[in-house]
C-alpha cells in the first residue's frame, strides 16, 4: 500500500450504468477512477466537475505509461511528461548467471523484438570469447535480424499506426484498429498481415520458433541453413517486395492529408544517431556509430559502439522508470538525439540496394536538411522494409550461405564485452562484465526507446501545445498525443526491461498541481 488514501465517490446506480453504457459504446474499454468531486458526462470522456477526468491507456503501443500535461493560468500547455510506469529490471536478473545463457535469457525481455536482444547479447558474448565468428554465421545472423525488422515494422505500421493514417486522427475510437482498416481497405490490412507473416516465418525457419528463439549463440549460430529452407524463403521474396512497394505508394499518396500533423509531430531540431557501414551505407548488424545534426551536418563519425559510455550519458528522472539517454558532448538539455528508422535514413549515405536507394533519394527530398518530423518515421519504416527484403535476397543467394561451419568454440578470454546492433526501434547496446568463473557480475542495456525518450517528451509537448485547448481532453487531442508516441514505436518492455501491454494515463494539471482532467484506459 502506498499510504495515500483514495477519495471515495458515491455514485448512483443509474449514473454508473449511464456512464458505462456511453463509454462502452464509444469503445473506451477499461475502468475509470473518479475522485475529488462529483462526476458528469463529457462529450467523449468522463469529466470531473472541478478537477479530474481519467483515460487509461494510450492504445496501440506496447507497455504501460502515463502522460502529464501542465497548464498555465491561461489554460495553455507549458510542459509535458511521458512517464513509463512499469518496472522489472532485467539487468539484476542476469547477475550470477553464466554469460553463455545471456542471449537466450535476454531474448525474453521482449516478444516483439527478441531477435535484436539475442543478436546484441550474442555479440557481447563474442567479445567475451574474443572470437571472430565464421563468415556464414555472420551472414545468417544478418538475415535473422533483417527478418525481425520486417515483421516488427509491419506490426508497427499496419497494425498500430495505419488506423490513424487510413481512418484519420478523429475517427471513431471503436473503429481505430486493424479491424477498421480491414473494413475500409481490405488489401492494406492483408498486406500488413502478410508482411509480418513473411518475417516471422523466416525467423521460425532459421531459429526454430518465432518467439524467443535461441538459435544465435556465443560464437555464431547453433545450426546451419538447409537448402530446403533457403529455397522456401527465396520463393516468398517476390510477393514481399511487391507488398512493400505498393505500401510505399499508398503511404506517399495518403500523408498529403496530414500536413498539420507533419508540422507538429516531433518536428524540431535534434541530433540523429545510427550505425553505418564503413562506406556510410545502411546496416542493422555491424559498423560504426555516426551522429548528424538537424541540418544533416556530420557531428561525429567512426565511433566504436564498445565505447558508448564515452559519448552517451543516461539520466533517470523521478517521474519515470525509463532512462533518458543523451549525447554527452552537448550535455543533458542540448544532447537530445533520435534513433530508429528516421535517424538511420538521416545518418546513412545510401541503403545499398536498388529499390530502397531509389526511395531513399525521394525521401531525402522531403527537406533540404535532415528529415525532422517524427511523422515520417512511418515512411522510413517502409523504406527499411524494402531494403531488408532486398538485402535478405542477396544474402540468401550468397554461395557460402549453406556452409556448415557456423560456430566458433572458445572459452572466455576477456572479462568485459559490448555488443551493439540496430533493433527496429534504434541502436541497442548490451554490456556485460564477468568474473573469472564466467558468471555475470554486472550488466547494462541501453535501449532504443530510452534513447528516444527526451525526443518523445518534446514531441508530446509540441502536439499538446498545438491541439490542447482549455481544461478538457477531447478524443482528437488524445489520439494525436497517442499517435506521436506511436510514430516512435516505443517498446516499453524493452526500455524498462519488463513485460506487459500498453496502458496509458493522461493528466492535465493546473499551475498549482491540481488535476483538471485525467483519462485512464487499460
Question: Predicted regions span which residues?
Answer:
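Active-site bordering "gate/hinge" segments
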Residues: 41-427, 447-522
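Intrinsic disorder/low-complexity segments enriched in polar/small residues
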Residues: 6-7, 18-19, 42-45
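Extreme N-terminal basic, low-complexity initiation segments
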Residues: 1-12
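Active-site catalytic microenvironments in core metabolic enzymes, especially phosphate/sugar-handling
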Residues: 438
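N-terminal basic, low-structured, amphipathic or hydrophobic segments
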Residues: 10, 15, 19-22, 27, ...
